[in-house]
């Protein structure tokens, strides 16, 4: 088995990037160890962290689009659109979270009142597809992080 993962450009066979093959158990353990601290942060803090992420992607938009286009073989305009979707997903998720997860009290059976609260669950695994390597996984990663979960991502 190889020690490194190498991504090649379909059109030319040139190496796009390479990296060490990770140890999944080690990565899950690291995420599990980091999760309590991340989950303890307020939703406002997590929103701000995700907005900083979106700004970092925006600042490197051309580089990300270049990498996606080279690695997948898709047209550059489509790769740019994918990167835009990655950026926009942050605000979409923040708005959806605010609308769908407020703490609220509701009437229950027999006249009882119950409180509905949302809480983080732990570590989530996200597997990325080859055809939309940033946009589709990001659609799971951003909401999971916003909700206070940790994520292990396998591109």
PLM feature spans:
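Nucleotide-sugar donor-binding loop of glycosyltransferases
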Residues: 155
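A short hydrophobic/small-residue beta-strand
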Residues: 150-152
């Amino acid at each position: 088995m190889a020690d490194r993962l190498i991504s090649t450009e379909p059109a030319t066979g040139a190496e796009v990037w390479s990296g060490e093959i990770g140890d999944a158990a080690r990565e899950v353990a690291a995420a599990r160890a980091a999760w309590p601290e991340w989950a303890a942060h307020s939703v406002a803090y997590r929103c701000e962290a995700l907005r900083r992420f979106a700004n970092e992607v925006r600042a490197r938009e051309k580089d990300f689009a270049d990498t996606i286009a080279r690695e997948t073989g898709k047209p550059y305009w489509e790769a740019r659109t994918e990167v835009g979707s990655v950026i926009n997903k942050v605000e979409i998720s923040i708005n959806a979270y605010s609308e769908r997860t407020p703490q609220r009290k509701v009437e229950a059976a027999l006249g009882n009142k119950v409180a509905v609260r949302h809480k983080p669950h732990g570590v989530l695994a996200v597997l990325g597809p080859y055809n939309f390597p940033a946009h589709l996984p990001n659609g799971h990663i951003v909401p999971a992080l916003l909700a206070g979960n940790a994520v292990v991502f396998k591109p």
